């Protein structure tokens, strides 16, 4: 699935506006990028398109069940199209979203996904050493702007309607605001291990 930076060209903006309260304005009046060509090229290479869709992928003897939504930050997510219990026959069940909005995380946890993978926050992009992220650019609290957490935040493994949440700080910045403070770019390697018997 895609995020806003796959759909629209970057443009000059006040980089500190990111720290202000969200006005709901999404700056979609800039030229669109050729994302359909990107999608088609990915699909031709075997990509599982999770844009408001579910899919199943076999890796060796394991079955992975996925559900994904289009960018919640733009309001493109269609949770009703992927809602419902995760595939109980799958070995691993993963929800995927560009932006970790609570409505999406809540739905995936309620539906029984083992983990939800997201990005969008850039780890807060501007962090204070010893404090952490100041904002997430979504409704997720700054303490979970990057890394591995539980969702809901106060849940424990095995709790009903709960899952793991991994938010990647990612490697991206805007070409017009190459700023990251106390928040290094990152690429994440997650290692999945089996549950204790």
Please give the residue ranges for each predicted region.
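Core catalytic region of metal-dependent phosphoesterases/phosphodiesterases
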Residues: 1-58
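Divalent metal-coordination and catalytic microenvironments
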Residues: 3, 49, 66, 98, ...
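Catalytic metal-binding/acid-base residues of hydrolase active sites
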Residues: 4-7, 54-55, 70-72, 100-101, ...
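Short, hinge-like loop/turn segments at secondary-structure boundaries
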Residues: 16-19, 68, 84-85, 134-136
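Beta-strand-turn-beta hairpins that frame and shape the catalytic cleft
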Residues: 47-48, 54-66, 88-92, 151-165, ...
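N-terminal post-signal-peptidase region of extra-cytosolic proteins
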Residues: 51, 76-82, 138-140
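Catalytic-adjacent loop/helix segments of enzymes that bind and process anionic phosphate/sulfate esters
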Residues: 66-97
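Conserved beta-sheet core of the metallophosphoesterase superfamily
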Residues: 100-188, 196
């Amino acid at each position: 699935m895609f995020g806003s930076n796959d759909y629209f060209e970057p443009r000059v903006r006040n980089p500190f506006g990111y720290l202000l309260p969200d006005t709901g304005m999404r700056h979609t009046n800039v030229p669109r990028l050729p994302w359909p060509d990107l999608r088609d090229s990915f699909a031709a290479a075997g990509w599982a398109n999770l844009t408001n869709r579910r899919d199943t992928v076999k890796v060796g003897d394991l079955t992975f069940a996925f559900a994904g939504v289009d960018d919640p930050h733009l309001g493109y997510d269609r949770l009703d199209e992927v809602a419902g219990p995760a595939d109980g026959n799958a070995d691993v069940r993963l929800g995927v979203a560009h932006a970790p909005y609570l409505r999406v995380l809540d739905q995936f946890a309620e539906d029984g996904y083992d983990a939800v993978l997201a990005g969008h926050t850039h780890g807060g992009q501007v962090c204070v050493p010893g404090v952490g992220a100041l904002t997430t650019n979504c409704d997720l609290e700054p303490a979970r702007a990057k890394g591995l957490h539980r969702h809901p935040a106060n849940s424990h493994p095995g709790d009903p309607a709960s899952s793991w949440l991994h938010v990647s700080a990612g490697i991206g910045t805007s070409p017009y605001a190459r700023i990251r403070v106390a928040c290094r770019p990152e690429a994440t390697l997650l290692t999945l291990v089996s549950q204790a018997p």
